[in-house]
Amino acid sequence: MRKIVLFSGSSAVGKTAVLSWVVDCLRERGLSSAVCKIDCVSDEDKETFRALGVPTVAGISADICPDHYLVSNIPEIWSWADGQGSDVLFVETAGLCNRCSPATRSMVAGCVVDATASCKAPGHLGPMLSQADFVVLTKVDMISQAEREIVCRAVADVNPGAEVFAVDALAGYGVQALSRYIEAAPAVGTYEGDVLRHAMPAGVCSYCVGECRVGSAFQQGVVGKMEFEEDAR
């Protein structure tokens, strides 16, 4: 039995920084961690966790959608974590597509949001935020209390049931509360019978499989076309 916790969010919001603090806090509380980092190009983030003494594996999706890649590798990730004997398995996503939601029902799903981005940012995150169990607001040291409350309100409009944690990932402020939340989360014994919380976007157009030419004649599979209003003024 182990806890499996997903950290999703856009690029450069501070997922790795927050998670580095969390694994350290959990170690102090007697819980061992393992980390799986999904990325597209570079696997350098795994060295951040290995420097903390945390078993870490990196998956590079390359030309494949990283969130589709993650879901396709859940059985293998689970088997790897079995060999590490960890109490908590953290999975950090690549953070590219705001529409994707690789969380499953048995995971504890978290969404990391940059508090400095915009008060409208939460409304653009889709299932990544709306299906999350908890939300981490990062860079809160760079905004006022009033601005923080506005962002929290925007998060609640999308996901009113999520626990919200305000974190300064540079100093570690707020990480203790997040660590206690994860410590109290339920453990699961297997991925068997697990299902995604939300369907993935279709990924079967001609460009998904390597087409480079532009034009309707070269578009096959699931192709979405815009509708243009006659009066756009």
What is each of the regions a protein language model found here?
Residues S32-S33, T56, A109, A162-V164:
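Hydrophobic anchor at the start of a short beta-strand
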Residues F134, D141-R197:
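Canonical P-loop GTPase G-domain recognition
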Residues R2-V13, A17-T104, V140, Y173:
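Nucleotide-state-sensitive switch-loop elements of NTP-binding domains
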Residues V35, C111, V135-L137:
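Structural beta-sheet core signal
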Residues M1-A17, V23-E28, G189-R233:
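P-loop NTP-binding site
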Residues N98-T104, K120-G123, S144-I150:
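Conserved ATPase-coupling elements of RecA-like P-loop NTPase cores
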Residues V71-E76, Q176-P186, S206-E211:
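Short, surface-exposed amphipathic charged segments that create phosphate/polyanion-binding patches used
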Residues G95-T116, G126-D133:
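Inter-motif core of Ras-like GTPase G domains
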